[in-house]
Amino acid sequence: MIHLVDYALLKPYLTVDEAVAGARKAEELGVAAYCVNPIYAPVVRPLLRKVKLCVVADFPFGALPTASRIALVSRLAEVADEIDVVAPIGLVKSRRWAEVRRDLISVVGAAGGRVVKVITEEPYLRDEERYTLYDIIAEAGAHFIKSSTGFAEEAYAARQGNPVHSTPERAAAIARYIKEKGYRLGVKMAGGIRTREQAKAIVDAIGWGEDPARVRLGTSTPEALL
């Protein structure tokens, strides 16, 4: 199952030395991708040979103007193999769908064919919001729906009626919707995945086997999934 893991070190206080050590651990473990903030991308890029470099964009809030998001993703595409970009959450919650559509089509296009995972921040969404957002993500040509930044606010999530961490139930619902719609999208679950048992339950709930082109698990503790 380790080959499905996106090993993420995204805390704001991460040091350069810790980012370098993380890259070496990623190579040693054989994870799918090593995920870092943009500042570390040039530092860790030369250290990754087997493992893909994933860089986050507009993380964790999804609050930059579209022009800034396009410029950032375009630059990241020069160094990253994969880009995890946060959806414009405020626009989603405002249900300004035309603006969300314009943003994501432009931002995904700026990645120049790199694998793009759009972070929906599931803990913050009502069903009518999440399913409309999934439709737009598919239309934009992204490659994965990613469930969370891992930085979601528990109190707000509770007011929306959602758990703050990944669950098999949410994983199954995302996969089911993708299948029903016939979308060519993978599922990446992230947020609170800290044991092999949790990971297996989520992968089983998705029901697509263990293909990293379709299923990913985001965690900061990959060794716990061995």
Swiss-Prot record:
SMART domains: DeoC. One of its GO terms (biological process) is carbohydrate catabolic process. One of its GO terms (molecular function) is deoxyribose-phosphate aldolase activity. Its EC number is 4.1.2.4. It is found in: Cytoplasm. It catalyses: 2-deoxy-D-ribose 5-phosphate = D-glyceraldehyde 3-phosphate + acetaldehyde. Keywords: Cytoplasm, Lyase, Schiff base. Optimum pH is 6.0 for 2-deoxy-D-ribose 5-phosphate cleavage. CDD domains: DeoC. One of its GO terms (cellular component) is cytoplasm. InterPro entries: Aldolase_TIM, DeoC, DeoC/FbaB/LacD_aldolase, DeoC_typeI. Pathway: Carbohydrate degradation; 2-deoxy-D-ribose 1-phosphate degradation; D-glyceraldehyde 3-phosphate and acetaldehyde from 2-deoxy-alpha-D-ribose 1-phosphate: step 2/2. Homodimer. Catalyzes a reversible aldol reaction between acetaldehyde and D-glyceraldehyde 3-phosphate to generate 2-deoxy-D-ribose 5-phosphate. Belongs to the DeoC/FbaB aldolase family. DeoC type 1 subfamily. This is Deoxyribose-phosphate aldolase.
